[in-house]
Amino acid sequence: LRRSRGLGDVYKRQIVNSLNSYIDNIVENKSKSKELNHGEKLVGDVTQEFKLEEQIMKESGWGNFLANCVSTWIDLELKKKISKFQLVNSWIVRQFENEYNPTHWHGGHISGAGFLKVPETLGKHVQEKQNREYRGGNLQLIHGSRMFLCHSTMNIVPKVGDFYFFPNYLMHTVFPFKNNKDERRSISFNAYIDNDIYNVYGKA
């Protein structure tokens, strides 16, 4: 797992604003929304999911941002320089009250998710639970099973401008939120890097 750091809040804010402006226009354009619809290929039970066009990925800086983050991540973790970053696809998830994304994983080598809009409140426990973290609207990463001194899940509270990167096979889910009619808007992607760097166990 890698959280984007060190690239500057202003730069990330510009990307978020550019993408949100583009998305708002797509939402208003019914024919374009239908053309870019990606929901039938995804597992989410949410209001809308649609693919990003190549032009906006270039103009917003989203594609370069991903390439830079992944390159830095691989260098920090493996001390290796990637020579290939192929963005396979990127899409928007528009989630509203009581909607969710079940446990799933992605294709490619590297995947990730980031947050473009987050409601002010995501709800609270139905019962009084003082010592239990409320997870409505959270992104949860899942790997293996719980063992001694080792948790199998990691919960991420969504915050606008935060972006997370992980291997494509890492299972994850998004919990429903409640008591708020506002939109939770996220962005995801799949990408390939050098096969000899990704395939640490030898040739496939």
Task: Name the predicted role of every residue range.
Residues 88-165, 175, 182-183, 197-202:
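Catalytic core of non-heme Fe(II) oxygenases with the double-stranded beta-helix
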Residues 188-204:
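Double-stranded beta-helix
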Residues 20-45:
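Histidine-centered catalytic/metal-coordination loop motif
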Residues 39-105:
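Signature of the catalytic double-stranded beta-helix
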Residues 170-173:
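Short, charged beta-turn/beta-strand-edge "cap" motif at the junction between a beta-strand
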Residues 1-11:
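Short, small-residue-biased leader/transition segments that mark boundaries at the very start
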